[in-house]
């Protein structure tokens, strides 16, 4: 499996993602935002960070980078694209995913471990019959997912919600919502389910000595179901 991680000015999770992908068998290449062509890829990842310093809006300037045209063509051809945190923000700013990501409910930067419940387990990102609650890490100031009434109806009708913020038992409620996100949404797909955006960082949970192992389960499922 070949993957590409896009580096923007201000990305700070690109190397973490590179380590995670290689650990689980991907042949990964780092791609600079000013490049115009993607290398051979089965998966393209837009990593976390603060692209362009989060000026204007988070992800807005990065969504206009030269590489985004190739990513758009790749996605329209059915290629798998994943955006984590700032990468999720870039995907909504580019129109590849619905909705927007607003300031957190209490206007504070949040950095902590949380639990998420996987939805739509028939897709290649969360296809695991033994597990549907994951412990991941979040670190963001703008993770409050929001969209119009028409959009949220369409998202629910098409089963596009990938992850809900939950407690450790998988209960989705106000108490388990860290940022005010609509319907506790932590991640969404496009209609075709080949593009995923999520605020939590699975790449930070791949070493039990440092954090946890739920990210390992995520990446193992990912590569197994891309084969």
Task: Place the predicted regions along the sequence by residue.
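N-terminal beta1-alpha1 cap of cysteine-dependent amidohydrolase-like domains
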Residues: 1-84, 91-98, 104-110, 117, ...
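Amide-donor transfer/coupling interface in amidating biosynthetic enzymes
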Residues: 72-76, 101-227
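A secondary-structure boundary/capping signal
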Residues: 84-86, 140
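Short, flexible active-site-adjacent loop segments at beta-strand->alpha-helix junctions, enriched
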Residues: 87-88, 122
């Amino acid at each position: 499996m070949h993957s590409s991680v896009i580096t923007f000015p201000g990305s700070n999770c690109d190397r973490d993602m590179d380590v995670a992908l290689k650990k689980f068998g991907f042949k990964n290449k780092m791609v600079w935002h000013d490049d115009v062509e993607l290398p051979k890829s089965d998966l393209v990842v837009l990593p976390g960070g603060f692209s362009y310093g989060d000026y204007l809006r988070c992800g807005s300037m990065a969504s206009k980078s030269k590489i985004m045209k190739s990513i758009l063509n790749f996605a329209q051809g059915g290629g798998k694209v994943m955006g984590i945190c700032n990468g999720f923000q870039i995907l909504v700013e580019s129109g590849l995913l619905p909705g927007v990501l607003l300031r957190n409910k209490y206007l504070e930067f949040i950095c902590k471990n949380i639990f998420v419940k996987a939805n739509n387990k028939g897709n290649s990102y969360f296809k695991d019959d033994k597990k549907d609650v994951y412990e991941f890490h979040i670190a963001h100031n703008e993770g409050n997912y929001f969209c119009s009434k028409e959009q949220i109806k369409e998202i629910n009708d098409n089963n596009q919600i990938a992850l809900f913020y939950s407690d450790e038992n998988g209960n989705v409620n106000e108490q388990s919502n860290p940022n005010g996100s609509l319907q506790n949404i932590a991640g969404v797909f496009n209609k075709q389910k080949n593009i995923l955006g999520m605020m939590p960082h699975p790449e930070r949970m791949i070493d039990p000595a440092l954090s946890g192992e739920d990210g390992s389960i995520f990446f193992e499922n990912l590569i197994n179901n891309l084969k």
